[in-house]
Amino acid sequence: MDPTPALAEIVASLARVRVLCVGDVMLDRFVRGDVERISPEAPIPIVRVRDERAMLGGAGNVVRNIVALGGRCAFMAVIGEDRAGAEIGGLLGDEHKVDSFIGIQPNRRTSVKTRFFAGSQQLLRADDETIAPLDPYDADRLLGDVRSQITTVGALVLSDYGKGVLDGPVAASLIAMGRTQNLPVIVDPKGRDFTRYRGATVLTPNRKELAEATGLPTGTDDEVVTACRQVIARCGVDTVLATRSQDGMTLVGADGSVLHLPAEAREVYDVSGAGDTVVATLAAALAGGAPLAVACRLANLAAGIVVGRVGTAAVPAADLMAAVHQEEVSARDSKIVGAEDAREVVDKWRRHGLRIGFTNGCFDLLHPGHVSLLRQARAACDRLVVGLNSDASVRRLKGDSRPVQDETARAIVLASLADVDLVAVFGEDTPLGLITTLLPDVLVKGADYTVDTVVGSDVVLTNGGRVLLADLKAGFSTTSTIARLHGGSRRSGDTL
């Protein structure tokens, strides 16, 4: 069975994680109203304000997302001694799962981004802020706060919005601390010089940031991979996760690995803060022990949710769990194919060096004998294809009273099993045509057969494959189960 933890298990584990986040906090202010006329003073719309609200932005939005997922957070940032800074302090105070260590610089203007909306249409954004590195005293105080918390967390996030908190030696010192503690260090970068993040576990640039940092095009999959590899080689980071809007995400590792994840959003209303959601979900999942590729899948799902909402939204754990369940349903349904589609899928697997296994049957009423055979078959290969007799095929083999369940129901049940990677329905009496098309590396049947009597064994053996006769689980068969349901008795020798 696949040892990768289920996404649902990872989402459930997020309530037990604690993440340390350091970066540029800001106040995101949203002004909403209606546009009914154009100003007589200039060709601009007049917004009649209906609503105004403020929320944590920048690194603060990363914190909001970690908490929304159920996690806890230690948060280090710097604000000004002003009204916006006081608002940020109040908003952080409302987050009971956040331990805040916020420095105050009297001469600093807290970053405020004010967005004006008419309906769902953004009209204007106005920024009010100071962009300057921390003075040595504030930098040392911030690093001291990090030292006091870093042994109590499962991941470290650097959320760099280019406002100065992570300038100078601060970022390098933080990354060194994280790696000393064997923590995953996730950096949301800013600017053209990614060498400042040397030693990070994951960089998460968007497409534009990646292009600016490398001077390379980032329009296609191959171009993105090339740019990511340049960052890895030049900057000494372990991996780069490039976020690509409608084209999804691409994860590239220093080991040469590449993973493309398609975009999950059905409708996009607002991309504000989507990168923060990716970083937060990635960090929380890694803090919970998820493998990097799995954490990226979860982050991709979360991003698909958040861009469907207006404003810098956070994704609650319940919404992410619902998306996970929907993905599992879609993945299950995509496992059910015809012979031609099966060949395309198998060819793709082969190009990745995977060993293909094959077994077949009617699988009318699934029982422990079926499960045992499928488990043994999956253990002998990397991907298991199950050939499923169509309804017409079953009737010819078993009689007009069979199958009990139609082929759609039987295929759905099989596709729901973790040991089954693909279900291919065939209409012939035997799977010989399907076996000849797919040319599996391992052909599996029950031990009540001999190698010579297994349909397709000659094809597989001639092609360099092997035949596996799986141990049978005594006392289980579909035919005897049906007989008992009708008041009959179990018949010895009943088969699948």
UniProtKB/Swiss-Prot annotation:
InterPro entries: Bifunc_HldE, Cyt_trans-like, PfkB_dom, RfaE_dom_I, RfaE_dom_II, Ribokinase-like, Rossmann-like_a/b/a_fold
Binding sites annotated in the UniProt record for ATP: N206, R207, K208, E209
GO cellular component: cytosol
Record-annotated active site: D276
Presence of keyword Nucleotide-binding: yes
Region (Ribokinase): 1-331
EC number: 2.7.1.167, 2.7.7.70
UniProt key word Transcription: no
Source domain of life: Bacteria
One BP annotation, GO: ADP-L-glycero-beta-D-manno-heptose biosynthetic process
SUPFAM superfamilies, sorted: Nucleotidylyl transferase (SSF52374), Ribokinase-like (SSF53613)
Catalytic activity annotation: D-glycero-beta-D-manno-heptose 7-phosphate + ATP = D-glycero-beta-D-manno-heptose 1,7-bisphosphate + ADP + H(+); D-glycero-beta-D-manno-heptose 1-phosphate + ATP + H(+) = ADP-D-glycero-beta-D-manno-heptose + diphosphate
Oligomeric and partner information: Homodimer.
Alphabetical list of PANTHER family matching this protein: BIFUNCTIONAL PROTEIN HLDE
Name of this chain's protein: Bifunctional protein HldE
The species this protein was found in: Rhodospirillum rubrum (strain ATCC 11170 / ATH 1.1.1 / DSM 467 / LMG 4362 / NCIMB 8255 / S1)
